[in-house]
Swiss-Prot record:
Belongs to the SDA1 family. InterPro entries: ARM-type_fold, Sda1, SDA1_C, SDA1_MD, SDA1_N. Residues 227-260, 485-512, 623-689 are annotated as: Disordered. Disulfide bonds: none annotated. One of its GO terms (cellular component) is nucleolus. This is Protein SDA1 homolog.
Length: 689
């Protein structure tokens, strides 16, 4: 009889639902019967909306499952559910409310309700004190907007929803406003709403009175794009000589100290130009989409000055302001005195504040303002009464500020800082060397003669531009080399070098690389011809070449090679090497938009750990280690234990009278005496030290 009871369709809704989906026309009467029952249950529910109604939940899910089969009868069904939720969502039972929301989600998935109407309702429901419901609605909102924009951007729906979210961010309910902000941030990160309007709506959240909303908005602007590619050290094979080519030339040439030094210098210059050639990676594209960064930064600074939030939130404010000022090159002169108040060695998170001070400087900051920041850092950090780490951090910060704003450095201060090159602390001396290296490329004339190093063509041309001066060129620097190359092509070519050379037999690719050793001589000859030309003649020739012909990739390659040679070749009349000049530094000039904390905190020599730190490291290493012996791995992990292992775990009383134990050779009494005497002598020697 139980099998026959399952066929009673009016009471067995799952079976009826299955049959309707297979053949809607045959079960139209049964469906209408359930629909009338649903209408009567709704009227009963409206009388007592605070009480759960199991029949209503079952019928609502049944109608949602079969709605696509009888759309003509269920035109008002989505609107009925929407009105129920709008009217009674505050008093409704949580399970009942969740069921109605799931039914609406099901109707939306079947495209039986417009997205804008449903999403506006769901944003209203975010005010409910129901964590599970809010999580479900958040997931659906993000997924639905993603599906709407899957094939193409639906600007009409996007505009409506963005306007609605703008009002939600100003809602009195903090939870609803926070989830609305989270939705926009998630859609931006998924590249669905990655337009300027979304970013500028999020900027309004940076001035929220609710700390959670404020922090979420600040983190959005301070974060990094997930799809941002990391800088790779891979070299381009067709962009001039690679490091591999240089190594081949050295390995196939004469091995002596002179060639080794030339190789090291060439590798450094190549590495530096690779960094310059690399495209700039924007830290976060959202900062570039802000409509009025000047006003935004001014409002943030005003909020920061009056803020009573935790110190971490204040740091986030300072970080965002410094990024806005540095990236957009804003004039926010009140920010620098505010930061200077925190530039003390004992200040909490002072390295981050130094980083923000460096980030906020750019070439348009007036020298008197940037010089005051530099003097504050020098007076508070770079003094002999501070530790070596503090002095190193200060010099690193000064270096980063001057790299972005060279006019901040005065000649007197630079000469004082350069004297730390011979400081007893390795970290301080290496930081000072890095600063000297920076000014060798910016303006060597500011350095004392003994710190300038061997002059090159590039350093001879280097100079710091005056405040507000534009360096607009009407020619391509280095283009003068093209005509020299054109003349050389008319001469007969001679192949004096080896045709090919390989790195080694166990090379990764197993390929042969053609290396013409005569190319070095050709480049040297070409460089000598250019060096012999006066500067005015070089510029005139470069302008003529730039304006008279279209340059090919091959031409640009030759120009890059010539610019590389400028940094390697000695200046005219300076071929003799001076002593105590060469200052080697691994620090390269950084040209990115943002700095990293490592640029400020970088120590060349790791400081010694104290006893507490070493002990903490030892104890941390012991937490995961169960045994103090190396565990022998078995060939087969599922194999049983050996007899030797079983003996170790066997009870001693079972082993006491075994033949192995009784026949075991033990130490004699005399051996024990000698061992005791030796140990006592060793202990006495240790105590006498």
């Amino acid at each position: 009889m139980s099998g026959r009871n399952n066929n009673k369709l009016p009471t067995n809704l799952p079976q009826l639902q299955n049959l309707i989906k297979r053949d809607p026309a045959s079960y139209r009467e049964e469906f209408l019967q359930q629909y009338k029952h649903y209408l009567s249950v709704i009227e009963i529910f409206k009388l007592q909306p605070d009480k759960p109604n199991k029949d209503l939940s079952t019928l609502v899910m049944f109608m949602a499952q079969t709605a696509h089969c009888f759309q003509q009868y269920l035109e008002d069904f989505p609107e009925q559910l929407k009105s129920l939720l709008c009217t009674h969502h505050t008093v409704m039972d949580p399970d009942q409310r969740m069921t109605l929301c799931k039914a609406l989600i099901m109707l939306r998935n079947k495209n039986l309700i417009s997205p804008s109407v449903l999403l506006e309702l769901f944003f209203e429901l975010l005010r409910c004190q129901d964590k599970l419901l809010r999580k479900t609605l958040y997931t659906h909102i993000v997924t639905d907007i993603k599906n709407i924009n899957a094939k193409h951007k639906n600007n009409k729906v996007n505009t409506t929803l963005q306007n609605f979210m703008y009002t939600m961010l100003r809602d009195n309910n903090a939870i609803a406003a926070k989830i609305s902000l989270d939705v926009m941030i998630e859609l931006y990160r998924r590249n669905i709403w990655n337009d300027a309007k979304t970013v500028n709506v999020i900027t309004t959240a940076c001035f929220s009175k609710v700390t959670k909303i404020l922090v979420a908005a600040l983190k959005f602007f301070l974060g990094k794009d997930e799809d941002e590619k990391k800088d790779s050290d891979s070299e381009s094979e067709d962009e001039g000589p690679t490091a591999r080519d240089l190594m081949v030339r050295y390995s196939t040439g004469k091995k002596n100290t002179k060639n080794k030094k030339k190789l090291d210098k060439a590798m450094k210059v190549l590495k530096k130009h690779k960094k310059k050639k690399r495209p700039e990676v924007f830290n976060f594209s959202a900062i570039h989409l802000v409509h009025d960064p000047q006003e935004f930064a001014e409002k943030l600074l005003k909020q920061l000055e009056a803020s009573k939030e935790r110190f971490e939130v204040k740091l986030m404010h300072m970080d965002l302001i410094s990024r806005l000022v540095g990236i957009h090159e804003l004039f926010l002169f009140n920010f620098y005195p505010f930061v200077q108040r925190f530039l003390q060695p004992h200040q909490r998170e002072v390295t981050k504040i130094l980083l923000y001070a460096a980030q906020a400087t750019h070439h348009l900051v007036p020298p008197e303002i940037s010089q005051s920041v530099l003097k504050t850092i020098a007076n508070n950090f770079v003094t002999d009464r501070n530790s070596g780490e503090v002095m190193t951090v200060g010099i690193n910060a000064i270096k980063e500020v001057t790299a972005r704003c060279p006019l901040a450095m005065t000649e007197e201060l630079l000469q004082d800082l350069a004297q730390y090159k011979t400081h007893r602390d390795k970290n301080v001396s290496m930081s000072a060397r890095g600063l000297i290296q920076l000014f060798r490329s910016l303006n060597p004339d500011m350095l004392q003669k003994k710190f300038r190093g061997k002059p090159t063509e590039a350093s001879k041309e280097a100079r710091i531009h005056a405040y507000g001066e534009l360096d607009a060129k009407d020619y391509i620097p280095g283009a003068e080399v093209l005509e020299v190359e054109q003349e050389k092509k008319e001469e007969p070519e001679e192949d004096d070098g080896w045709e090919s050379a390989s790195l080694s037999d166990d090379d990764e690719d197993g390929e042969w690389i053609d290396v013409h050793h005569s190319s070095d001589e050709e480049q040297q000859e070409m460089a000598e011809k250019i060096q012999a030309m006066p500067t005015e003649e070089r510029i005139a020739k470069a302008a003529t070449v730039s304006g008279s012909r279209l340059l090919t990739q091959e031409d640009f390659k030759k120009i890059r090679l010539a610019q590389l040679a400028k940094e390697m070749n000695n200046a005219p009349g300076k071929s003799m090497k001076r002593k105590n000049i060469e200052i080697d530094s691994d620090e390269e000039e950084r040209s990115g938009e943002l700095l990293s904390l490592r640029d400020i905190e970088h120590l060349h020599k790791k400081p010694k750990s104290d006893k507490e730190t070493r002990l903490a490291t030892v104890l941390a290493g012991r937490t995961d280690r169960k045994e103090f012996v190396r565990k022998k791995t078995k060939m087969n992990p599922h194999a049983s234990s050996t007899n030797k292992e079983k003996k170790k775990n066997k009870n001693f009383m079972m082993m006491r009278y075994s033949q192995n134990i009784r026949s075991k050779k033990k130490r004699s009494f005399r051996d024990k005496q000698i061992a005791l005497r030796d140990s006592l002598l060793k202990k006495r020697k240790r105590l006498m030290k």
